[in-house]
Amino acid sequence: MQMRPELLLPEILVFLGGLVVLLGGSFLPRDRQWIARAAAALALLGAATAAALAMAGPAQSAFSGTFTVDTATGTARVITALTTLLVLGVASGEIAGSPRESDTYALLLLATTGVMVLAGSTDLLVLIVGFLLASIPLYGIVGLTGGRAGAEAAMKTYLMGALSGILLMLGVTVLYALAGGTDYALLQETLPAAPDADVGAGVLGVL
């Protein structure tokens, strides 16, 4: 089995950065939360750099072909990391010194990891993992606004996310039953021979 976890270095950097910010921020006083922001920015810059360097080489696959690193993946990784870095810069003025400042940065990094996984996935199961990792932290970010309005918004976001997740997994189940696998290449090869209505239902659920 071809694992090659080093190909996921940008995702690993962002994920570890999120964990460091989440755990380390709990021990930082409110007036030193900028350290968590700096750590998050460094993780994003490191991920963008690693993704840009990976684009210089040929297309490669990891984890038995379920994740592909190519120009499209690299471009999405760089854009995602730099966009999140921009969000950190814009949001820092609003949340600087707040009790949940480091938590917000950590959740943003975890959500960013999910988006980057989505960009490189070549298997529906990896797509599900990326979707969950990208969406679940958003519930916390919405809820961190506090108060009754924040709780209501977090609940609505959770319900919409849960519904989307159920439809996604239902669509994946249908496509797996039709194709006998979840690999994108296998789906492209076998689905043209499957009933159009069934394929449409599966694709609609995934989308």
Where are these regions (language model features)?
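Alpha-helical transmembrane segments of multi-pass membrane proteins predominantly involved
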Residues: 1-207
